[in-house]
Amino acid sequence: MIPAGVDITDLAQQLHEDGVAYTNPIHGQDVDLNADVAKGLKDGDGIAVVDVAANRAPDVRDIAQELQDATGLDTVVVQTPQYVSSVSDTYSRADIEAVQPHLAPGLAQNELLNQYYAGLDQISFPVSATVGSVTLIAAIIFVSSYWAAVRR
């Protein structure tokens, strides 16, 4: 549930501009701050700093999901006074949930993004290597079985 006081439309509009959004209008209009934070984002990602108290962490994830749906961004990180949450089309839910507990809500946005991406890059699962290994093992088993059957 989206907490009262969170204007998804306004945040989405800010995210469309430079990938950075604030509920605080002073920060939202600070061009230098937004440009500095935007440098820490990967292409297609966004961050929203929401100065509204959320009662539960899933509410913050709901904000992130609504913003992703409204903007089409690949990954949306939402920082509130109590929680940090995100949704992504690139990173798995399990990887995101492994990183989020290590992100303190009060971090500066650049530091938050550095820790977020570093944590995700560290635990990224090597899909290509795993698929290649499984394929190789399956081929060895197939060839061994074939030769065993031909010899009989």
Which ranges hold each PLM region?
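A short, hydrophobic beta-strand-centered structural micro-motif
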Residues: 68-83
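Active-site phosphate/pyrophosphate- and oxyanion-stabilizing loops and adjacent acidic/basic residues
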Residues: 65
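A structural boundary signal for the start of the first folded domain, especially the loop/turn
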Residues: 1-62, 85-152
